[in-house]
Amino acid sequence: KSPDFKPICLKSTVTVSMRNTFDRQQSPNVIGYIPGSGNTDESVIYLGHWDHLGYGAPINGDSTINGATDNAVAIAWMLEMARCFNALKEKPRRNIVFLSPTCEETGFLGTKYYVEHPLFPIDKIAAVINLDVFPLWGENNDVTITGYGNSELDDTLAELAKKYNRYIMPDPDAYNGMFYRSDHFPFVQKGIPAM
């Protein structure tokens, strides 16, 4: 921390030997859908991962890392969306898919698997809407979008926000690159509009 600090090269080497074992584990993605009433080849995916970090260093004796905002709220959101879509008298034209992938916290492995083994044609996905880390600050009128400006869906969102008296809040931490670090990104890499 001193402004006078200057690194020096020690010209030394270190040899490390390590023995490691691992167990192969399986963890499922969870998916449900409501069939579309029209072009049932096309789908809209609502996405929210179900995993969290699990356990870590204890805080006040509790080592459980609770995942209420990341990402249990997204699961509640998807269940409510499914209930609302199912209650509609006139069903949407497209299939409405609810995908809750596993292992987002370890590199969105569940989503990567899904885009390589889709249950609905990957080239017929019209949009992917991802909810990750939902703030629980009470009612507000803003819609904060991670990576706003990077999605083909931005204009559609802007129209809807205006229609419902909401305003769009661009990603306040865009420098963190969160657009590239959540479950919608494997879909983006396949050319699918996602946010």
Describe every region a protein language model picked out.
Residues 17-21, 59-71, 140-148, 171-177:
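Second-shell loop/turn segments in exported
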